[in-house]
Amino acid sequence: MATSGANGPGSATASASNPRKFSEKIALQKQRQAEETAAFEEVMMDIGSTRLQAQKLRLAYTRSSHYGGSLPNVNQIGCGLAEFQSPLHSPLDSSRSTRHHGLVERVQRDPRRMVSPLRRYARHIDSSPYSPAYLSPPPESSWRRTMPWGSFPAEKGQLFRLPSALNRTSSDSALHTSVMNPSPQDTYPSPAAPSVLPSRRGGCLDGETDSKVPAIEENLLDDKHLLKPWDAKKLSSSSSRPRSCEVPGINIFPSPDQPATVPVLPPAMNTGGSLPDLTNLHFPPPLPTPLDPEETAYPSLSGGSSTSNLTHTMTHLGISGGLALGPGYDAPGLHSPLSHPSFQSSLSNPNLQASLSSPQPQLQGSHSHPSLPASSLARHALPTTSLGHPSLSAPALSSSSSSSSASSPVLGAPAYPASAPGASPRHRRVPLSPLSLPAGPADARRSQQQLPKQFSPTMSPTLSSITQGVALDTSKLPTDQRLPPYPYSPPSLVLPTQQPTPKPLQQPGLPSQACSVQPSGGQPPGRQLQYGTLYPPGPSGHGQQSYHRSMSDFSLGNLEQFNMENPSTSLALDPPGFSEGPGFLGGEGPVSGPQDPHALNHQNVTHCSRHGSGPNVILTGDASPGFSKEIAAALAGVPGFEVSAAGLGLGLGLEEELRMEPLGLEGLSMLSDPCALLPDPAVEDSFRSDRLQ
């Protein structure tokens, strides 16, 4: 017990002592806390004082430099230093304004709620356009609005605005953001254009503000006005902004705006110009429904309208189509191209193109010698053969025989008389496109053999003659009619008789005509169509060229469709009638014999070149650029010019045509004259030279 008692008291003492210790500890703790608090307060005070001073300094600095941060300063500088300077110069002492500003600023900043209604209003305005307080636009508007209230209010407003501007301006990013989003700012400031604000401000200031302040305001107004006229647009857009962020004057913002606007316009213009141009040039020209490979190229040609373009197109198409004939319209080649529907279409010229797209069948038709045959029919029994000259006759044929009246016109078959070999080649080229059209209705092409006469009526004499090649008349026919010449490649042309190919674009295939020689006898594609038959020299020295082009030469799968009952027969069809036949067949049926050799060659070449596919027309595998010249020569001087030669001619024509493309219509017409001389090998050579040039 004692122990316990002793312990008890001891414990009590311990406990008692403990409280003391606790109290001491507590006291110490409190003391420390107080010290810390004091230190903290000191620090806070220092910070606060520093902050205030910094703000004051900043305000003074900013004010001196211009209201608002660097950006606002810049803007103001652009808009007018007087506005900013006036406050500086104004009676308000920078120190006084600074102090006042500092106080107000402090109040406003710390308890923004306490901010005077003016400031709040300004802020609201600012925020309206830009919800963020950063928007510099609000400060400007608020400042201006404050100005009218009186010198003190104005000063106060300025001070307020400065702080807000400073705060907002302090972050360039904020300014940039606000500036970059001028639409809101502009929308807000725009309503109160600088000029408007100044006016109102000026009036209010004059009455309300101190004389000094009003003076300042006036200066500001003047500056603003000056600025406005000076930078009407800039002030409007930038001023609006500047008002908000004192950046109104900032030309930088306006510049970005303007540049943006300008860029937009120029891009639009560029886009409209460049793209539209390209589109017009490239896309529009192509047929609405161009055959993918050929037509795309073809349309270009078509657009080019010049034979040269056609030639290029043909080349591409022909190549793509593999209708090597295509362009040349070597009869075989032509057919071959015909076989390629696309090629055919490409073959057809721009006009042809049009017709091709719809008349394609026609083209084929005419091309198909069935229709051509008709023409040839008209001319001779050669119906097919004549038809064979679809290209040549095609023009006429087209119009006459086929609905492709357009093509006919295009072809200007009448114009194509072989007689004008010189002109014919170039013209032929031009008409060539039309020729494509001549293909005439698909039926024609279908009936190719059957229809020989069908086109004939349409074909009409010219066409018939052309087609016939019988046409020797062709000689009589103008060069244009001579168009057949490009079929000139007759051999290939004849080959083209194959209907199937013709259908698509037989026309180019005047070849069809050659092929068509015998509308009735469609030979197997494989069938060799040899224009073994030598045609009598006929008018053309070409005389008997044996258009030996075996169908195989044409190697047109389509040749099978050739209506040539037998190559010979086709050719033979009307040897007499075809006297020109060689020309007609080999060259363009229509082309008169004399013309045929050269004219045909040339025409053929031209035609081929035009179609560009001529060479492509593998029709005459033989056709080769090198051979082309020879072909021209051969056509001009070699009676025995064979289809293969014609094929070569096609190749040549293609090559030459391509070169010739630059010549254009004028060049073609020039060539036309030489075409007349074409019969003379020398002339032919010169003609070729021209083309090369």
From Swiss-Prot:
<feature type="modified residue" description="Phosphoserine">
    <location>
        <position position="489"/>
    </location>
</feature>
<keyword id="KW-0597">Phosphoprotein</keyword>
<dbReference type="GO" id="GO:0008140">
    <property type="term" value="F:cAMP response element binding protein binding"/>
</dbReference>
<feature type="compositionally biased region" description="Polar residues">
    <location>
        <begin position="339"/>
        <end position="351"/>
    </location>
</feature>
<feature type="region of interest" description="Disordered">
    <location>
        <begin position="1"/>
        <end position="30"/>
    </location>
</feature>
<comment type="function">
    <text>Transcriptional coactivator for CREB1 which activates transcription through both consensus and variant cAMP response element (CRE) sites. Acts as a coactivator, in the SIK/TORC signaling pathway, being active when dephosphorylated and acts independently of CREB1 'Ser-133' phosphorylation. Enhances the interaction of CREB1 with TAF4. Regulates gluconeogenesis as a component of the LKB1/AMPK/TORC2 signaling pathway. Regulates the expression of specific genes such as the steroidogenic gene, StAR. Potent coactivator of PPARGC1A and inducer of mitochondrial biogenesis in muscle cells.</text>
</comment>
<dbReference type="GO" id="GO:0005634">
    <property type="term" value="C:nucleus"/>
</dbReference>
<dbReference type="GO" id="GO:0005737">
    <property type="term" value="C:cytoplasm"/>
</dbReference>
<dbReference type="GO" id="GO:0006094">
    <property type="term" value="P:gluconeogenesis"/>
</dbReference>
<dbReference type="InterPro" id="IPR024786">
    <property type="entry name" value="TORC"/>
</dbReference>
<keyword id="KW-0963">Cytoplasm</keyword>
<feature type="cross-link" description="Glycyl lysine isopeptide (Lys-Gly) (interchain with G-Cter in SUMO2)">
    <location>
        <position position="234"/>
    </location>
</feature>
<feature type="site" description="Required for ubiquitination and degradation">
    <location>
        <position position="629"/>
    </location>
</feature>
<feature type="modified residue" description="Phosphothreonine">
    <location>
        <position position="169"/>
    </location>
</feature>
<feature type="compositionally biased region" description="Polar residues">
    <location>
        <begin position="1"/>
        <end position="20"/>
    </location>
</feature>
<keyword id="KW-0832">Ubl conjugation</keyword>
<feature type="modified residue" description="Phosphoserine">
    <location>
        <position position="393"/>
    </location>
</feature>
<feature type="modified residue" description="Phosphoserine">
    <location>
        <position position="368"/>
    </location>
</feature>
<dbReference type="InterPro" id="IPR024783">
    <property type="entry name" value="TORC_N"/>
</dbReference>
<feature type="modified residue" description="Phosphotyrosine">
    <location>
        <position position="488"/>
    </location>
</feature>
<feature type="modified residue" description="Phosphoserine">
    <location>
        <position position="456"/>
    </location>
</feature>
<keyword id="KW-1017">Isopeptide bond</keyword>
<keyword id="KW-0010">Activator</keyword>
<keyword id="KW-0805">Transcription regulation</keyword>
<protein>
    <recommendedName>
        <fullName>CREB-regulated transcription coactivator 2</fullName>
    </recommendedName>
</protein>
<feature type="modified residue" description="Phosphoserine">
    <location>
        <position position="90"/>
    </location>
</feature>
<feature type="region of interest" description="Disordered">
    <location>
        <begin position="476"/>
        <end position="548"/>
    </location>
</feature>
<feature type="modified residue" description="Asymmetric dimethylarginine; by PRMT6">
    <location>
        <position position="99"/>
    </location>
</feature>
<feature type="modified residue" description="Asymmetric dimethylarginine; by PRMT6">
    <location>
        <position position="168"/>
    </location>
</feature>
<feature type="modified residue" description="Phosphoserine">
    <location>
        <position position="70"/>
    </location>
</feature>
<keyword id="KW-0007">Acetylation</keyword>
<feature type="modified residue" description="Phosphoserine; by MARK2">
    <location>
        <position position="274"/>
    </location>
</feature>
<feature type="modified residue" description="Phosphoserine">
    <location>
        <position position="433"/>
    </location>
</feature>
<keyword id="KW-0488">Methylation</keyword>
<dbReference type="GO" id="GO:0003713">
    <property type="term" value="F:transcription coactivator activity"/>
</dbReference>
<feature type="modified residue" description="Phosphoserine">
    <location>
        <position position="613"/>
    </location>
</feature>
<dbReference type="Pfam" id="PF12886">
    <property type="entry name" value="TORC_C"/>
</dbReference>
<dbReference type="InterPro" id="IPR024785">
    <property type="entry name" value="TORC_C"/>
</dbReference>
<comment type="subunit">
    <text>Binds, as a tetramer, through its N-terminal region, with the bZIP domain of CREB1. 'Arg-314' in the bZIP domain of CREB1 is essential for this interaction. Interaction, via its C-terminal, with TAF4, enhances recruitment of TAF4 to CREB1. Interacts with SIK2. Interacts with 14-3-3 proteins, YWHAB and YWHAG. Interacts (probably when phosphorylated at Ser-171) with YWHAE. Interacts with calmodulin-dependent catalytic subunit PPP3CA/calcineurin A. Interaction with COP1 mediates nuclear export and degradation of CRTC2.</text>
</comment>
<feature type="modified residue" description="Phosphoserine">
    <location>
        <position position="624"/>
    </location>
</feature>
<feature type="modified residue" description="Asymmetric dimethylarginine; by PRMT6">
    <location>
        <position position="51"/>
    </location>
</feature>
<feature type="compositionally biased region" description="Low complexity">
    <location>
        <begin position="352"/>
        <end position="378"/>
    </location>
</feature>
